[in-house]
Amino acid sequence: LWQGEHPPEAPISAHRMQAVCYGHMLCVTRGLPAVDVRVVYVTRRGKVQGEFPERLTAEECRAEFQSVLLPYLRRIRAVRRHTRARNASLAALKFPYANYRPGQREMAVQVYTAIKRKKRLFACMPTGTGKSSATLFPALKALGEGLTGQVYYLTARTTQRQGALDALARLHQQTLHLWALVIDAKDKQCPTHTLCHPDYCERAKGHFLRDTEAIEEMMAADDWSAENVRAVADKYCLCPFEFAMSLCEIADVVICDYNYALDPAVHIRRIFDATRDVTLLIDEAHHLPERIRDMLSGSVDSAGLRKLRTVVGKAAGKKHPLYKAMTDVIRAVDSLLLPEDGSMEGTLPKLPDDF
């Protein structure tokens, strides 16, 4: 699908490589000595904007296909080496303090047992009793024993992460091999503050063509701090947030906000929409009901809709179906949200059936 203002002069490299991969598969499955591949760009209305045919031998297809797979093969091997080193270090891991505080050992045992048995655990402990260490330590031991694939430490606020970071820092003093990633809010990580689209941001343009080397550099490093992730992203001109999203697939521990695991709109789909063995350690879980209500609630602002309708009207005209539909929605919102007391805000217990 081509959405540019001018016809393409050459195929985008990723699109050409996709065609080459198809060509290789045809050569292998049908025993072809050569194959003709073609990248075609069309508009939404079906108008052809560019055609780029190419004839390749089976050997040329095979060589290019292998060149695409090679970085992923290196990544798999690196992850396996790291996993062996990580598990060995976790097997030797000791509790980071000489003695347990009251209740810490019991909590650690319950956390480990819950992970092993794939059960939920709701634990209450007073502030200052070392909950972060009492949950992370057994979770890491379970990770090293293959009882879980990843550990996600979820917090309600950024300030709450420090306890988990301090606990991990103390554990790292034991020569721990661990890829621990912190995910910050997307708007805080954005260095350009432009529209997140390849047409407007150089970091978004071709991001996934450049992130392979950056991921390899991170896998060779022990420092997965937010500062180092941003530094590597800058080095390769990557979007720091999308780079962190790629790293979370191979990270051992991820520290992030509730949203990235539980909010249907912004959760990490490549992790939580897939069948993965993930353990969630949810700090201050009593905040969850309010946060979940916010995640699942929606609001409609007729003033905002009017501004958007004005933009649509200038671009497409007042007779456009979208403009008319927005007018209908604005009228419906005004009629629904005007309480008897005359205030400009209202709350609906549920949406009307005909809304």
Locate each region found by the language model.
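Generic beta-sheet signal
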Residues: 119-123, 149-151, 253-256, 278-280
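Signature of the SF2 helicase/ATPase Hel1-core->accessory helical subdomain module
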Residues: 135, 141, 162, 166, ...
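Conserved pre-motif I regulatory segment
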Residues: 81-124
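Mg2+/Mn2+-dependent nuclease catalytic core
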Residues: 1-63, 135
